[in-house]
Amino acid sequence: MHKLLKLAAMGTAACALLAGMAPVANAQEKQNVEVLHWWTSGGEASALEVLKKDLESKGISWTDMPVAGGGGTEAMTVLRARVTAGNAPTAVQMLGFDIRDWAKQGALGNLDTVASKEGWEKVIPAPLQEFAKYDGHWIAAPVNIHSTNWMWINKAALDKAGGKEPTNWDELIALLDNFKAQGITPIAHGGQPWQDATIFDAVVLSFGPDFYKKAFIDLDPEALGSDTMKQAFDRMSKLRTYVDDNFSGRDWNLASAMVIEGKAGVQFMGDWAKGEFLKAGKKPGEDFVCMRYPGTQGAVTFNSDMFAMFKVSEDKVPAQLEMASAIESPAFQSAFNVVKGSAPARTDVPDTAFDACGKKAIADVKEANSKGTLLGSMAHGYANPAAVKNAIYDVVTRQFNGQLSSEDAVKELVAAVEAAK
């Protein structure tokens, strides 16, 4: 059975981790994995297909549990309902502090055996290990490193604007003004709290990684209430003037489509957006440009899709470990992340198969990891527990929508974070 499980997992692991601990009651019986995830958009679904096909080729059937909603909030709601009902999925896509919450409850399994054997400690960046381990034990397998401080620009629109990529705030505003003059929507944006916060992440990071760390990771009241933070909110107000009237509630992938179709100039979004461009047959450097938000070069705010394994009966543990192993295999890390638009969760995966944006992502992550500027994203659950993140979301969204002045937003931010700690 061990051999069969090994085949089943090698390269499908992600699927499996995604899917989790496949129920393996009998080696003769077809194995099955049940996967709770929120990869439902075009590019994400393509990446998931890599996993499904790999699983199928190993004789493992797939029970899909997709939950729409890019931030994963809805998926967590479904998961809590399942666990409360005593029917947890075997593996679940999770982010940051959500993993810690389940680990604190003693609900997750232990992957130490495979992690130790394969030397995960040496190849998975320390900032990721802070979430993939709990009390010194591995409880999740990181699938990727998504970075959030990206801009995705329509190349034709950029060329019409002179072709210069903006490297600072003033150049960004000049570019957005040019897009407006071209008669297209300057910024493609979806008015959802997590999307507003994704822009705010990059804006705050543009004031320097030290400031970002003090404000969003250390939650330093002085940084949160500073004039620098007020400037960040002022910039959000300015950016708000470049979105279209119909932005409220728009899903992120529909905003990506606006840039892809030339209806908008730029989207501020994590590198999962690249999957949408690729799905539409677009090529980096020819049809679109990927670059870091101006002022954030040399730093990376990340989130990482991980698959947390729930505690399972003894007979299911071997499959669980085999699948975790498969997820971390360099071959799978490369194949999956090429399609997903992310960088591998390991620093030793060659960039050979990656396109220009992928190569840049891998290089940026390595640089940031070595400089100590690989920082957990506030907007995506890698800087703070959910209560704090949601408190920040609330202030950011109200300010972005004109319900708070920058001065009031700074005051509310300090109070909201303090109350949520």
Curated annotation (Swiss-Prot):
<keyword id="KW-0762">Sugar transport</keyword>
<dbReference type="Pfam" id="PF01547">
    <property type="entry name" value="SBP_bac_1"/>
</dbReference>
<feature type="signal peptide">
    <location>
        <begin position="1"/>
        <end position="27"/>
    </location>
</feature>
<keyword id="KW-0813">Transport</keyword>
<keyword id="KW-0732">Signal</keyword>
<keyword id="KW-0574">Periplasm</keyword>
<dbReference type="InterPro" id="IPR006059">
    <property type="entry name" value="SBP"/>
</dbReference>
<comment type="function">
    <text>Part of a binding-protein-dependent transport system for a sugar.</text>
</comment>
<protein>
    <recommendedName>
        <fullName>Probable sugar-binding periplasmic protein</fullName>
    </recommendedName>
</protein>
<dbReference type="GO" id="GO:0042597">
    <property type="term" value="C:periplasmic space"/>
</dbReference>
<comment type="similarity">
    <text>Belongs to the bacterial solute-binding protein 1 family.</text>
</comment>
<dbReference type="InterPro" id="IPR050490">
    <property type="entry name" value="Bact_solute-bd_prot1"/>
</dbReference>
